Amino acid sequence: MSLLKEFKEFAMRGNVIDLAVAVVMGVAFNKIVTALVDGIIMPCVGLLLGGINIAGLSFTVGDAQIKWGSFLQNVIDFIIVAFAIFVLIKLINLLQRKKENEPEPVTPEIQLLTEIRDLLARNSSKI
């Protein structure tokens, strides 16, 4: 089997495609969360702290500038993204559980077979 054919089979497997879609959606979701944090949450936090721009907070040690505010903002970004993904997964799991708990509709064939079984059981008990 050629290398190109093997790669094509690998790439067309469902889990690889699912992973690619998840990565693209994750990047898009990250942009949304970053906009939320940068545009809404951090300015509100800055207002609560007296109008301070948290991302710009830093201190200098010798010639090195330690940008701890930027680090703090990235930690907050991570926490919000992780929490949002957690909530999304919980919602998906809840919907899947609901779907699994729903009984399958009884087809006419199954209903007929059930009636035949019940009739046979009643007739055999009379013998």
Curated annotation (Swiss-Prot):
Pfam families recorded: MscL
- InterPro entries named among the record's database cross-references: Mechanosensitive_channel_CS, MS_channel, MSC/AndL, MscL_channel
Keywords carried by this UniProt record: Cell inner membrane, Cell membrane, Ion channel, Ion transport, Membrane, Transmembrane, Transmembrane helix, Transport
What Gene3D superfamilies does the entry give? Large-conductance mechanosensitive channel, MscL, domain 1
Check the record and name the SUPFAM superfamilies matching this protein: Gated mechanosensitive channel
GO MF: mechanosensitive monoatomic ion channel activity
Identify one Gene Ontology CC term for this UniProt entry. plasma membrane
Subcellular location, in the record's words? Cell inner membrane
Major localisation: membrane
Role noted for this protein: Channel that opens in response to stretch forces in the membrane lipid bilayer. May participate in the regulation of osmotic pressure changes within the cell.
Subunit-structure text = Homopentamer.
- List the protein's name: Large-conductance mechanosensitive channel
**What gene does this protein come from?**
mscL
